[in-house]
A protein has these predicted regions:
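Conserved acidic segment of CheY-like receiver
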Residues: 7-28, 61
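Output/docking surface of receiver
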Residues: 15, 92-96, 104-124
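A generic structural motif
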Residues: 31-40
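Acidic, metal-coordinating helix/loop segments flanking the phosphotransfer/catalytic sites
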Residues: 42-60
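His-Asp phosphorelay/catalytic-motif detector in bacterial-type signaling
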Residues: 57-59, 83-88
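Conserved phosphotransfer microenvironments
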Residues: 59-80
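Short beta-strand elements of ligand-binding domains
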Residues: 64, 88-93
Length: 128
């Protein structure tokens, strides 16, 4: 139990279960040798994501910028308006042109295609 308490807490938002599974499988339980293990928390709606961020402590948020109803970019912007103390945020994007919008929302972008190496490096950099 004590080991789980020392794990990094990552919230992953996507309305697409396959995207969530791809991210978790790509990053794994440890994104880099010098970082602790990860405990993943998954959400499929923006409302639940906002509630969880409001009521829990996370080390990193990963949001799907291509979520259909409410994009991860919109969720990131809303969280920055509502919360005082946020962890780093990564937004998964489909287009390089979205990078400026992700920055405006207070996050960093990870452009598709999502490869394991790209995701591991982005997660490790955000957590350091």
């Amino acid at each position: 139990m004590a080991e789980a308490e020392n794990n990094l807490q990552i919230l992953l938002y996507s309305d697409d279960r396959e995207v969530r599974q791809q991210v978790i499988n790509s990053v794994g339980i440890k994104p880099a040798a010098d970082l602790p293990k990860i405990t993943w928390d998954e959400t499929a709606t923006a409302t639940i994501t906002r509630d969880k961020v409001h009521n829990n402590r996370y080390d990193l948020l990963i949001l799907d910028g291509e979520a259909t109803k409410i994009s991860g970019i919109s969720v990131a912007k809303t969280l920055h308006e509502e919360e005082n103390d946020l962890p780093p945020i990564l937004v998964l994007t489909a287009r390089q042109q979205d990078e400026w919008l992700v920055g405006w929302a207070g996050a960093k972008s990870v452009e598709r295609p999502l490869t394991p190496l790209k995701l591991q490096e982005a997660v490790a950099a955000a957590l350091r």
